[in-house]
Amino acid sequence: EQQRFYVLTIFIPATAAVAYFTMATGFGLTEISVNGQVLDIYWARYADWLITTPLLLIDLALLAQANRNTIYTLVGLDVLMIVTGLVGALAATPAIRIVWWGISTALLVFLLYFLVQSLNEAASRQTESVRSLTTTLRNMLIVLWLAYPVVWILGTEGTIGLIPLYVETAAFMVLDLTAKVGFGGVLL
């Protein structure tokens, strides 16, 4: 049963590894000026998320045997969330950055609500082991994904800037490793 997830799941950490390699070697980075301060924005992180987060959702939806409309809705909300987060990171004024962060975070909340509602319904028709695994993976994603906008707003990409770039990058890396490699380890 779990073998059908191997191919899809292996692309999640593989894509993240490529993105982190590009960031580590100085690519996937752009500088923007916000209030006279130059900020390093790792756009490769968003490229990674644009690929890997839909794959995580597809994996989870396939496990629960959700229908196509559910999968399309989850992926559509996810793509909008990532793109609006990137727009916020690239915005040159603090107020606009906060607005885009708010839009992206609202999309995240709506996505997570839809994820719970739709996957509970789909998984309810599956075996107890599938329901349990779906619930575990879903809850794992919810907890981890709720941390991303907090790191964003407190870090250099947000306007608060309480945590420096290296701490922000490390926090995103830990979240990504847990959400991607951890997810795959639990699923497979």
Where are these regions (language model features)?
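Polytopic alpha-helical membrane-helix bundles and their juxtamembrane interface segments
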Residues: 1-44, 53-188
